[in-house]
Regions:
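Short loop/turn motifs at secondary-structure junctions and domain boundaries
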Residues: 25-28
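Short beta-strand scaffold segments in enzyme catalytic cores
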Residues: 31-38
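Short acidic-glycine loop/turn motifs at beta-strand connectors
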Residues: 38-40, 118-119
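Glycine/charged-rich beta-loop-alpha catalytic/anionic-binding loops adjacent to active sites
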Residues: 40-51, 76-80
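Short amphipathic alpha-helical face segments that pack within enzyme cores
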Residues: 59, 63, 96-99
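Short, solvent-exposed cationic patches
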Residues: 60, 65-81
Length: 138
């Protein structure tokens, strides 16, 4: 749903937009940035990285979440913002990223808000599970 953002959320979207500058996307030229606010208030960043060995690349969202889980596992991700450059439309996470977002929510025991921005608009969900209602469970 398209919403009015708080100052903190607007800043997180701006941080995600800035993170697109660190993306390595020589093949698609689609630069994606992500920024996450942890419960402690710390902000983490991720950007996509493409490889000549195509499946070896990594999306911005998973790059950020894997870093967060490896280094801040006890500090839950409260909100993640996603942005792209070019920004012709809102940037929605791929299926793999949606699955990992739900996995992270389960691991941390709390929902992760997701802000998907682009072209001057933002759509937000209050839990990543809303992006993947029929999630894989082993």
């Amino acid at each position: 749903m398209n919403i009015t953002l708080s100052d903190a959320d607007r800043e997180l979207v701006r941080e995600a937009e800035r993170a697109t500058a660190n993306a390595h996307a020589p093949y698609s030229n689609f630069h994606v940035g992500a920024a996450a606010r942890l419960r402690s208030g710390k902000i983490l960043y991720g950007s996509n990285f493409e490889s000549e060995v195509y499946p070896a690349g990594l999306c911005a969202e998973r790059s950020l979440m894997f870093y967060a889980q490896a280094n801040y596992a006890d500090d839950p991700i409260e909100t993640m913002a996603i942005a792209s450059n070019p920004s012709e439309r809102e940037c929605y996470p791929c299926g793999q990223c949606r699955q990992v977002m739900v996995d992270v929510e389960r691991r941390q025991g709390s929902p992760m808000r997701v802000l998907m921005s682009g072209h001057g608009t933002v759509t937000a969900v209050d839990s990543a599970s809303k992006l993947l209602p029929f999630t894989f469970i082993l």
